[in-house]
């Protein structure tokens, strides 16, 4: 991805100082937009937040020593939850030290930022400029950033492709997003005021994409791919009835009647136990179609 002298030594020897400066600026511009995947590029720091929080330094779990640095890690999680880039110190202090007065909050901010930088052992990871904090994407990979870019690319393909010509590209993007979304944002930790917004936004985006791409697969007859989308949707939230409906319909289309009826029974049980509700008329209608198909199969 980066231009280097090893790629073409003669090219570099012929360049003037001005041209070399241009190449350096080009390298910087390229590095500001790393590839979506974390494969093929080694970030000094990689942060996983979709599920269990994991922090890797040079592809190894960061060694905290004898005591886990609780406050710096909370600072880092809060920074990511607020967007990770150009977050004002006042936003961070309000989230982390809401009861502290201005001076005490600022001292806590300065101390915690120092400890976090020391923990990384690299000042390039965290940038403080004009009172705003950023994780440098040239040196730090965050799963949430990649996940949201993936979903954005999925939607761009969906908005342009009505023929199925980009099915392979779409499948690759969805497989990558499925592998990243192990669970909700910081799911293993207590929900806080600063984490709930991002958690719900990512969850809603993912659910929307699973439904949308599932419909795309149905439209083009890729029933098994649609089934995978809807099954993942139920893993994310098993109270969303439309996932049951579409899953039942896919099993009906592929003549997997037993599987479709099992989905209905699960839907009925979950809705009754958790919400005290009965399935919607559309769910019941698909169930009746499954029953009819079973009867036809038995009488054939």
Model-derived regions: residue spans:
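Short capping segments at the starts of secondary-structure elements
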Residues: 79-92
């Amino acid at each position: 991805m980066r231009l280097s002298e090893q790629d073409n030594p003669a090219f570099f020897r012929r360049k003037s100082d001005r041209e070399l400066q241009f190449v350096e600026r080009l390298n910087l511009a390229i590095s500001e937009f790393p590839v979506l995947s974390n494969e093929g590029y080694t970030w000094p720091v990689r942060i996983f937040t979709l599920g269990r929080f994991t922090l890797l330094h040079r592809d190894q779990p960061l060694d905290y020593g004898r005591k886990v640095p609780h406050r710096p890690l909370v600072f880092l999680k809060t920074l990511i939850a607020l967007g990770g880039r150009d977050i004002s110190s006042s936003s961070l202090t309000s989230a982390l030290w809401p009861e502290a007065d201005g001076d005490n909050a600022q001292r806590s901010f300065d101390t915690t930022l120092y400890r976090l930088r020391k923990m990384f052992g690299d000042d390039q990871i965290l940038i403080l400029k004009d009172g705003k904090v950023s994780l440098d994407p040239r040196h730090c990979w965050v799963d949430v950033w990649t996940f949201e870019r993936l979903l954005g690319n999925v939607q761009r393909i969906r908005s342009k492709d009505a023929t199925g010509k980009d099915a392979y590209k779409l499948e690759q993007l969805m497989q990558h997003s499925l592998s990243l979304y192990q669970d909700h944002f910081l799911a293993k930790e207590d929900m806080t005021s600063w984490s709930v917004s991002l958690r719900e936004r990512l969850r809603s985006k993912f659910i929307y994409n699973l439904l949308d791409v599932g419909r795309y697969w149905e439209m083009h007859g890729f029933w098994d791919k649609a089934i995978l989308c809807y099954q993942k949707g139920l893993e994310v939230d098993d109270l969303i009835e439309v996932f049951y409906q579409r899953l039942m319909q896919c099993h009906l289309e592929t003549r997997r009647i037993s599987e479709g009826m099992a989905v209905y029974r699960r839907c009925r049980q979950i809705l009754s136990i958790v919400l005290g509700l009965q399935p919607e008329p559309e769910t019941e209608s698909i169930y009746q179609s499954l029953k009819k198909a079973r009867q036809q199969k038995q009488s054939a």
